[in-house]
A protein has these predicted regions:
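Beta-strand-rich N-terminal accessory domains
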Residues: 1-66
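Structured core elements
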Residues: 14, 27, 36-37, 73, ...
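Active-site-proximal structural scaffolding
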Residues: 17-21, 65, 97-99, 125-127, ...
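Short acidic-glycine loop/turn motifs at beta-strand connectors
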Residues: 30-31, 39-41, 76-77, 136-139
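Catalytic and substrate-binding clefts that recognize carbohydrates or anionic sugar/phosphate headgroups
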Residues: 44, 48-96
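Extended, loop-rich substrate-binding clefts of extracytoplasmic carbohydrate-active enzymes
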Residues: 77-127
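Acidic, contiguous internal or C-terminal segments within carbohydrate-active enzymes
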Residues: 110-154
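Conserved small/polar residues in nucleotide/adenosyl-binding loops
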Residues: 155-164
Length: 165
């Protein structure tokens, strides 16, 4: 099965299905701040030291599940979905993930609404930025509820290794 392709012009790897065998990760970073972002918006962020200064929660032994991360939820009527498919796993009408040099763009489409989530770490700043762009091509007016979720950790790796799973 083919999961994506290289876009040489834009210097990106384009993933065309969220259901890859394992999370496909892009490493984003500046001098001090780093984020690892998967093709379904999973991953984690840390400041200088991934073991001692992790900012968001991530369990290494759960990595095939890829549930913790940088998630955007969109509620359209009774349907809740994510541009990166996880964690709701709501079937999308279309999906792409573009892992580029210093950024990841996830784009999902559901019921005429396209959501594009761009994640990047700006050079010289110790932060991650998420930019969400919504477009309604459904032909009807929509009222959407949109919210983001990230599991904040402020802990070190040893604390997560001793948790019960």
């Amino acid at each position: 099965m083919r999961f994506g392709h290289f876009d040489d012009q834009n210097k990106e790897y384009v993933i065309t299905t969220p259901q890859t065998p394992l999370p496909w990760i892009n490493y984003l970073g500046s001098e001090d701040f780093f984020s690892l972002v998967s093709n379904t918006a999973g991953g984690y962020s840390f400041y200088r030291d991934a073991r001692l200064r992790r900012l968001t929660r991530y369990r290494y032994n759960s990595s095939p599940l890829d549930m913790d991360g940088h998630h955007i939820y969109i509620k359209d009527g009774d349907t809740v979905w994510n541009p990166g498919w996880q964690p709701t796993k709501t079937e999308l009408d279309s999906y792409t993930c573009r892992h580029g040099l210093g950024y990841t763009i996830l784009e999902g489409r559901k019921n005429g609404v396209t959501a594009q989530q761009e994640l990047f770490v700006p050079k010289g700043d110790a932060c991650e930025l998420d930019r969400l762009t919504l477009r309604n091509d459904s032909g009807t007016e929509k009222e959407l509820d949109v919210f983001s979720y990230v599991a904040v950790s402020y802990t070190h790796l040893r604390a997560h290794e001793t948790e019960l799973h």
